[in-house]
């Protein structure tokens, strides 16, 4: 059995809707194999929502104008295609827009139903004069990739229903590059960097997760031909190994104050793993272990990327700390670790 070092994936957040994902180390050649597959999947196969057709009051086709509206229907459709929407519905849903001039018509004027959200409300759709009035229905559907207005046209659709081009993909841009990285004495391993930029309807990490799920499903078809076939097995995760080492660490290595240390030892807490299994409420039940001790422990654990277990619902740490014996001398003066 061939065992390779398990790659790790880290995310560098550039802004709310752009991230760089680094996957390393990869066996030589796998950087381009994985990078190309991820890029194509991200650009073409991430589900999303878009407007598929509109119906404007008083309009029969797109090659006309609306009284009191500066933009003609063609320009109106071009603006509508820039709408960023998300929908929880598998079936088509309708949004409504009604606006009386004068003034601008923006995406914020659209009234979406429950389960549908417009993510760029500042988008300008049209300009109305003093006598202008715009009433419109916008049909939203879920899908993948790009679908033209011709494909969106339905047989026997009602008169005045105008199909529009639909860009379902929530991903705007994907680039990747492969660099060399070192593993022990070898310098020919691959480091894959994938830069993902999305619309406001989806975070880059969610798009990346969706692409990964799709690829796993597809490559699983080949695996099912012979589930016992030999391949390259990934070794243990370095993150898991580091976490395991932290959890077995004795609490002596946290370098707590004498009071906190002795309180924990009296309670039978000897390792970091036993400590993180306790909640703040559990620790405040320990005699002489109060708010200052809690803050000290939380700070030490945070430095390791760890934290205490969640307290029960309704737990009030402030009230609990006030009732604790923190820093009350009460004859409790210990100066040795034991």
Curated annotation (Swiss-Prot):
It comes from Streptomyces avermitilis (strain ATCC 31267 / DSM 46492 / JCM 5070 / NBRC 14893 / NCIMB 12804 / NRRL 8165 / MA-4680). This is DNA-directed RNA polymerase subunit alpha. It catalyses: RNA(n) + a ribonucleoside 5'-triphosphate = RNA(n+1) + diphosphate. Coiled coil: none annotated. The keyword Signal does not apply. The gene is rpoA2. Belongs to the RNA polymerase alpha chain family. GO terms for molecular function: DNA binding; DNA-directed RNA polymerase activity; protein dimerization activity. Keywords: DNA-directed RNA polymerase, Nucleotidyltransferase, Transcription, Transferase. GO terms for biological process: DNA-templated transcription. Residues 243-338 are annotated as: Alpha C-terminal domain (alpha-CTD). The N-terminal domain is essential for RNAP assembly and basal transcription, whereas the C-terminal domain is involved in interaction with transcriptional regulators and with upstream promoter elements. Homodimer. The RNAP catalytic core consists of 2 alpha, 1 beta, 1 beta' and 1 omega subunit. When a sigma factor is associated with the core the holoenzyme is formed, which can initiate transcription. SUPFAM superfamilies: C-terminal domain of RNA polymerase alpha subunit, Insert subdomain of RNA polymerase alpha subunit, RBP11-like subunits of RNA polymerase. DNA-dependent RNA polymerase catalyzes the transcription of DNA into RNA using the four ribonucleoside triphosphates as substrates. One of its GO terms (cellular component) is cytoplasm. Its EC number is 2.7.7.6. It comes from the Bacteria. The lineage of its organism: Bacteria, Bacillati, Actinomycetota, Actinomycetes, Kitasatosporales. Residues 1-226 are annotated as: Alpha N-terminal domain (alpha-NTD). It holds the Pfam family RNA_pol_A_CTD.
């Amino acid at each position: 059995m061939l065992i390779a070092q398990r790659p790790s994936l880290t995310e560098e957040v550039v802004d709310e809707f752009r991230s760089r994902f680094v996957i390393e180390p990869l066996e030589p050649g796998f950087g381009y194999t994985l990078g190309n597959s991820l890029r194509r999947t991200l650009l073409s196969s991430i589900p999303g929502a878009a407007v598929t057709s509109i119906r404007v009051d008083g309009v029969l086709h797109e090659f006309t104008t609306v009284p009191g509206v500066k933009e003609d229907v063609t320009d109106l459709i071009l603006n509508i295609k820039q709408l960023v929407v998300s929908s929880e519905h598998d079936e088509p849903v309708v949004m409504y827009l009604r606006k009386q001039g004068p003034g601008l018509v923006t995406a914020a004027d659209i009234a979406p139903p429950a389960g549908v959200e417009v993510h760029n409300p500042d988008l300008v759709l049209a300009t109305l004069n003093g006598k202008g009035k715009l009433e419109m229905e916008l049909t939203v559907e879920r899908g993948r990739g790009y679908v033209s207005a011709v494909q969106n046209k339905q047989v026997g659709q009602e008169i005045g229903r105008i199909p529009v081009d639909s860009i379902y993909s929530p991903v705007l841009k994907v680039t990747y590059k492969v660099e060399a990285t070192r593993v022990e004495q070898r310098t020919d391993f691959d480091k894959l960097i994938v830069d993902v930029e999305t619309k406001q309807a989806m975070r880059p990490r969610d798009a990346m997760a969706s692409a990964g799920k799709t690829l796993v499903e597809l490559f699983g078809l080949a695996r099912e031909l012979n589930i016992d076939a030999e391949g390259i097995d990934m070794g243990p995760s370095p993150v898991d190994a580091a976490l395991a080492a932290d959890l077995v660490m004795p609490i002596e290595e946290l370098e707590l104050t004498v009071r906190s240390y002795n309180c924990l030892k009296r309670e039978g807490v000897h390792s970091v793993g036993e400590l993180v299994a306790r909640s703040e409420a559990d620790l405040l039940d320990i005699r002489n272990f109060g708010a200052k001790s809690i803050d000290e422990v939380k700070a030490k654990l945070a430095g390791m990327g760890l934290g205490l277990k969640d307290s029960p619902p309704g737990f009030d740490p402030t009230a609990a700390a006030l009732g604790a014996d923190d820093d009350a001398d009460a004859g409790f003066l210990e100066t040795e670790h034991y």
